[in-house]
Amino acid sequence: MFANTTAGGVYRWSDGNVSTVLEKRRGIGGIAVHADGGFLVSGRDLAYAGPAGLRTVWAADGATGLNDLTVAPDGSVVVGVLRHQPRRGEAAGPTELVQVAPDGGTRVLASDLLWPNGVGYAPDGTRLYVCEYAAARVRVIGPQGASVFAEAPRGECDGLAVDVEGGVWVALGSGGGIARFDSGGALVELIEVPGRFVSSLAFAGTAIYLTTIGALLRMDVGVPGSEIPAAAMQID
């Protein structure tokens, strides 16, 4: 599945065919599969999409929206909070990355991120990586706190995915490509995607699917992605 952030909606690609899964909702920065077969989407809030339609499960006070997200090993959801209006040209100020537990309780994992974007866990679940779009870097959050993990070789750090070897893949936005960093933060691969703004990426086996402005692309990178569990948030 993938979202059209500007025009709105969630779509499914299968065997060359695209179908609409959720209509109209704009500003979606992330999607996560839920354990009951529905899915969660960000946007103006964190919402559950199921047979009965959309239902808000969490919203951040004073936020302009919620951006990219992932699922933690315990089934909780980690999501970046937006507090500026990027479409109005507002500069990004420090904001939070929040973990929303299955029972709805929250914990702030970081509070000084400049436009939190792509987010993903290391295969062993001990470290969490998050892109800072406005700072063009990736931060890592671990037992000792948060630190800078890697800097974008060009462009920005937008979407993020992690492979089973601990490699961290980053969509480089206006940089026209994707980068792979090893678990120590060293750049080990830079793949060109000419003429494209690469906004996000996700694994399916050894293939990476890339979202760009106007296109969905696929490439095989020879290593599978780290498994992301289904969200276990309670839906009333």
Where would I find each of the regions flagged by the language model?
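Beta-rich, blade/repeat-based domains predominating
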Residues: 24-43, 61-84, 94-96, 110-127, ...
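Short loop/turn segments immediately following the C-termini of beta-strands
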Residues: 5-6, 43-44, 82-84, 92, ...
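Beta-propeller domains
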Residues: 1-23, 46-47
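Short loop/turn segments that connect beta-strands within beta-propeller blades
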Residues: 13-17, 49-53, 100-104, 142-145, ...
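Blade-level signature of beta-propeller repeat domains, shared across WD40, Kelch, NHL, RCC1
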Residues: 198-236
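A short beta-strand motif characteristic of beta-propeller blades
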Residues: 17-23, 53-60, 105-111, 145-151, ...
